[in-house]
Swiss-Prot record:
Residues 19-36 form the Peptidase S1 domain. Its EC number is 3.4.21.5. This is Thrombin. GO terms for biological process: blood coagulation; proteolysis. Prothrombin is activated on the surface of a phospholipid membrane that binds the amino end of prothrombin and factors Va and Xa in Ca-dependent interactions; factor Xa removes the activation peptide and cleaves the remaining part into light and heavy chains. The activation process starts slowly because factor V itself has to be activated by the initial, small amounts of thrombin.
Length: 36
């Protein structure tokens, strides 16, 4: 999912939901910050 999220930067909300389902939100915070 990380690869898809990085490719689709505009899908931040959808990407966040996917991460929450697959991985803890805390873990998702790091990649999200790097993307921004």
């Amino acid at each position: 999912s990380f690869g898809s999220g990085e490719l689709v930067x505009g899908e931040x909300p959808x990407f966040e939901k996917i991460i929450v389902k697959g991985i803890d939100a805390e873990v998702a915070s790091a990649p999200m910050q790097v993307m921004l």
